[in-house]
Amino acid sequence: MVYLSHMETRSCQKCEKNFNIEPEDFKFYEKMGVLAPTWCPDCRLQRRLSFRNERTLYKRPCELCGIDTISRFDPIRGIVNYCGECWWSDKWDPTTYGQDYDFSRPFFEQMGELIKKVPQQNLIVMYKTLTNSNFTNMNHYLKNCYYIFNSDYNEKCMYGEEMEHCTDCVDVTMAESTQLAYESFNCNKCYEIYYSVDCESSHDVWFSKNLMGCSNCFGCINLRGQQYCIFNEKYTREDYLKKLEEFNLNSNSSVQEIKEKAQKFWLKFPNKYMHGIQNLDSTGDYVFNSKYVKNSFITTGGEYCKYCMWLIVKNNKECYDFTQFGENTERVYESLCSGKNINDIIGCINALEARELRYSIYSYNNNSNLFGCISLKNHSYCILNKQYSKEEYEEMLPKIIKHMNDMPYVDKKGRKYVYGDFFPTEIAQFNYNETSAQEFFPLTQEEAINQGFSWKEPKERNYKISIVSKNIPDDIKFVSENIVQEILGCEHEGNCKEQCTIAFRITEPEFQFYKAHKLPLPHLCPNCRHYQRVLNRNPNKFWRRKCMKEGCSNEFETAYAPDRPEIVYCEKCYNQEVY
């Protein structure tokens, strides 16, 4: 392989937009032994996310023991579903599904067959660490939690995601060490926080954004160490509490009016160009404690990484196109949901404590030197789940890599996939609208099909909505516990791109939470609430802009698009404004 010492511009195979490959990118691809990509970063991310089903769950039996499970896999997709206990047990041997490598067919075609044969775990969880938290996914160490995802070490939380060490949080996304939170986003070390965004070390906060070390604030933004403020105006304690009673926070209509007012008020104040601290020469958003990290998103403790996302556990070095997890990783490329002491990984899904893996799925417990394997634990030198000697494996590996480049997989749209490319979506276990791809790259059914994705048609359900959205009681004071027997209609009625379930229920713990904190009932189903909440999160796209502070000439890359209404400052000007 010959690599360039200067930037090259290519046209994406999928979207046909131009993208750049920098000299340092070519050096990374050379180190990994892969061809430079022919898909742009956005389309590569979209394809990886189409293999990530976080929140679309089904009831289906384990195909080994017969027990009913909550599963990520739609029964009609043909994936063999095992419960956690059976999948981790020694009752079966995944190498019995091994198959010979066929040099007369593309590799990804053979991998697609193996995906349908080898049993896969129903959920991505450490099932022994879950207590009364069955209806969850991508979690461990939960107690009494319901419908939360990609979260760890939580108790009594509902309808949330990306939460760590939280208690009594409902409808919350991106939170750490937070207690008693509702309808909030990106909160760290907070207590009693409601309808708020980007807050840290604060308590008793309502409808506020970017507060630090504050308490008893309502509708505020960019405050530091303040208390008893309403829309950034200082009050006495007595006047603050009196004013708070006037807002009628029991009422959904009042809450919606205050939300709108607060969001308009926030637009009068500057935002820092990125969310992040203690970074060196790094670009992206929600990037922390990182060095030389470029175009990455929600990443902590990275070094020389690019196009990465959701690497929330630190110490990740020389990783490209790596989505979710992290923790002591090095030289990872085009991989998903992997981490914890891994290195030299290409095109893998759910690889933990492993090294020298290629195109392997659900690889746990010290695997090494695997190619195209599924559900192996503590194995080495396997190809398509078939065991080889070290010498046989090392002889076959370069032949397979050459074969993948000489006979690439070609999808129905005519797009080619060679060694180094992530799996084609055509062999995914999920439909597009079941996955995180729909969240970050929302499509209609027609758009998805035209782009080569599959789509899950809505299933007819045997229920009748008993209370349509407009008739849901406005004030929690007038709601009895009988509400848990009702089927409520979602306000969106399925007319959105938010995986709307059209109808939903209020659970008993959920009702008790609303009653205890005097909060109105939601008018949207959990999925639509999630999609509305993450509108507070900047997109994983970046633009070159200038600081909007008068007289400042600083430039930066930011996730705030030029046509957005927010005021955006460089770090220096922002800090001068708020500190």
Model-assigned labels for residue ranges:
Residues 2-579:
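Long, distal/terminal scaffolding or interaction modules
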